[in-house]
Amino acid sequence: MAIFVLRMKDFGMILSGDIGGTNTRLALVDKDDAGQLQLGTLQTYPSRRYQGLHEIVEQYLREHPASVEAACFGCAGPVKNGRCATMNLTWVVDQRELADALGIAHVRVINDLESMAYGVSCLQSKDIEVLNPGAPDAAGHAVVVSPGTGLGEAGMYWDGKQY
């Protein structure tokens, strides 16, 4: 849920992406009349078939034309100043270069596990599998562990109001 970095209230249509060493997943996200997030068509692309993220985004937008106001991509690898040397790929994903190449004014690149951590607050009880029953603290800290091409983790600190 990389889109939370951009605050949906500030934008209309947002392109959201999960950029991994094996696959890249893109989807458009918009709000319905009640202000609830609506996920558009989710498309998966084999990352290694492309020279860079911009090629995949261009293909996605040809297949799913939309007026995108902002984009946020969770990338597998360390991110510093909006730039990620992706793990298991030869790509460098840079938010300024993407903004220029795609003509999207607001582009953010964050770590993929940071992106997942933002999405934790959107989960409902039906989305959660309890591994170790106990008495959870509903307003406590949270952690995300994600096995994939690599193993990622992210922690979330609850400050009493938000993560």
State where each predicted segment sits:
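Short beta-strand-loop/turn "lid" adjacent to the catalytic site in phosphate-handling enzymes
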Residues: 64-109, 114-127, 144
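Short coil/turn connectors at secondary-structure junctions
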Residues: 11-12, 104-105, 138-142
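Active-site metal-binding loops of divalent metal-dependent hydrolases
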Residues: 19, 113, 149
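Short glycine-rich, Thr/Ser-proximal phosphate-binding strand/loop in the N-terminal lobe
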Residues: 9-59
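Glycine/GP-enriched mid-protein hinge/lid loop-to-helix segment characteristic of carbohydrate kinases
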Residues: 131-163
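Short acidic-glycine loop/turn motifs at beta-strand connectors
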Residues: 30-33, 82, 157-161
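Short, acidic Gly/Pro/Ser/Thr-rich loop/turn segments
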Residues: 24, 78-80, 150-154
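Acidic, Ala/Val/Gly-enriched low-complexity intrinsically disordered segments
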Residues: 2-5
